[in-house]
Swiss-Prot record:
Name of protein: Dual-specificity RNA methyltransferase RlmN
Residues involved in S-adenosyl-L-methionine binding: 215-216, 247, 269-271, 346
Cofactor names: [4Fe-4S] cluster
Cofactor notes: Binds 1 [4Fe-4S] cluster. The cluster is coordinated with 3 cysteines and an exchangeable S-adenosyl-L-methionine.
Pfam families from the UniProt entry: Radical_SAM, RlmN_N
EC number: 2.1.1.192
Native species: Gluconobacter oxydans (strain 621H)
GO MF terms held by the record: 4 iron, 4 sulfur cluster binding; metal ion binding; rRNA (adenine(2503)-C2-)-methyltransferase activity; rRNA binding; tRNA (adenine(37)-C2)-methyltransferase activity; tRNA binding
Stored Gene3D superfamilies: 1.10.150.530, Aldolase class I
Catalytic activities: adenosine(2503) in 23S rRNA + 2 reduced [2Fe-2S]-[ferredoxin] + 2 S-adenosyl-L-methionine = 2-methyladenosine(2503) in 23S rRNA + 5'-deoxyadenosine + L-methionine + 2 oxidized [2Fe-2S]-[ferredoxin] + S-adenosyl-L-homocysteine; adenosine(37) in tRNA + 2 reduced [2Fe-2S]-[ferredoxin] + 2 S-adenosyl-L-methionine = 2-methyladenosine(37) in tRNA + 5'-deoxyadenosine + L-methionine + 2 oxidized [2Fe-2S]-[ferredoxin] + S-adenosyl-L-homocysteine
Domain Radical SAM core: 144-378
Gene Ontology CC terms, in alphabetical order: cytoplasm
Length: 407
């Protein structure tokens, strides 16, 4: 059944284009984000988790236990370059110091609750965190090039309620902390044995990060930014900012900050070319309409002809896939360094949408391509394990609901 989109009669919130309003809105987002803060990264016995701490925080902890700050540099190397989780494996640190570190600290990973591998070799991890909450991470291999992307979650659940997205049916529980965000990538590396970190001239199986998992990363910006700085540090995991892409549904006030401070690649979950439709399928549009979103894209400092903004567009049959939609999309992005990823809708239990026909996908792609924009049609990956775009939702929640007896 094709979903029916009803016109929205709610008034649109006024523009937040001015600097003062943007600053006020960023503060509002920060305050709201704090309500969903992750738990402190500390064990019940009081030991502190060292994963997710900045270099400065590591140095301060060393001072607290009576050690020289240079110990932080040693720990950084062992934690993020070597991937060590046991202090006794840190052979450049004397044994008495290893014991002292183990008394005060841990180097942890999220627990792998389940791990599934698709027929196309896509692998989905359900990671469980210290408080029992869970999020999904997906590794998408490109065997032709011996490389692959790690799709990382930034929140448990999501607050956006996009109507075509499975994650949107799971309410936001909380934000993930830096240790939990970095930990997803580190645990995936553990699974593939990719330690120590490969040098710049060596191939990496886990070669890129896409912040396209569960949650809206710009609604958890502080924790995401801290995690990405750790991952980009040249003496640790050392993943270039050019190999990291953040996907947002359009949290306009935070886009400038992300570009200025992180300079990572930007992807926009667009999915509609009119405010009337986008208000319905991406409700965040009611706060930050398309005009403001495109203006923020024009300002994004990391965008260039060599680092184009990616516009993600899930093709929904009879909803957003007409030739007129394609022409309007071209008009919207006409002065941007951009490419368009056309994504066939990936069905999930309970959804009313249907994927566009192959013929309509091709027509749409050709219109965009003829206007000078790359418009590949994405090949669905991991559909059989609900790991494809728009399908993520913690499997444990689904299992619990199906196993709960009726009263």
């Amino acid at each position: 059944m094709t979903a029916v989109i009803h016109p929205d009669i709610r008034p649109r919130i006024n523009s937040v284009a001015s600097d003062d309003l943007n600053a006020a809105e960023r503060e509002r987002i920060r305050a709201k984000s704090a309500l969903f803060a992750p738990p402190e990264a500390r064990l019940a016995d009081g030991r502190r988790d060292l994963v997710g701490l900045s270099r400065e925080e590591l140095a301060a902890l060393m001072t607290e236990i009576g050690e020289k700050p240079f110990r932080a540099k040693q720990l950084w190397h062992w934690i993020y370059h070597q991937g060590a989780t046991d202090f006794s494996a840190m052979t450049t640190i004397a044994k008495p110091m290893q014991a002292k570190l183990a008394e005060h600290f841990v180097v942890s990973r999220p627990t792998t609750a389940t791990e599934q591998t698709s027929v196309d070799e896509t692998r989905k991890f359900l990671f469980r965190f210290r408080d029992g909450q869970e999020a999904e991470t997906v590794y998408i291999p490109d065997r032709r090039e011996d490389r692959g992307a790690v799709c990382i979650s930034s929140q448990v659940g999501c607050t956006l309620s996009c109507t075509f997205c499975h994650t949107g049916t799971q309410k936001l529980v909380r934000n993930l902390g830096p240790a939990e965000i970095v930990g997803q990538f580190m645990a995936a590396r553990d699974s593939y044995g990719e330690w120590p970190s490969p040098s710049a001239d060596m191939p990496r199986y886990l070669s890129t990060i896409v912040l396209m998992g569960m949650g809206e990363p710009l609604y958890n910006y502080e924790n995401v930014a801290k995690a990405m700085r750790i991952i980009m540090d040249g003496e640790g995991i050392a993943l270039s900012r050019r190999r990291i892409t953040l996907s947002t549904s359009g949290v306009v006030p935070m886009m400038d900050r992300c570009g200025d401070e992180l300079g990572i690649n930007l992807a926009i979950s667009l999915h509609a070319v009119t405010n009337e439709l986008r208000d319905q399928i991406v409700p965040l549009n009611r706060k930050y309409p398309i005009e403001e979103l495109i203006a923020a894209c024009r300002r994004y400092p990391a965008a260039s002809n060599s680092r184009r903004i990616t516009f993600e567009y899930i093709m929904l049959r009879g909803v957003n896939d007409s030739e007129a939609d394609a022409r309007e999309l071209v008009r919207l992005i006409r002065d941007l360094p951009a490419k368009v990823n056309l994504i066939p809708f990936n069905p999930w239990p309970g959804s009313d949408f249907q994927p566009s026909t192959r013929q309509q996908l091709t027509k749409f792609a050709n219109i965009v391509m003829d206007a000078g924009f790359a418009s590949p049609i994405r090949t669905p990956r991991g559909q059989d394990i609900l790991a494809a775009c728009g399908q993520l939702k913690t499997e444990s929640e689904r299992q619990r609901r199906s196993a709960t007896p009726e009263a």
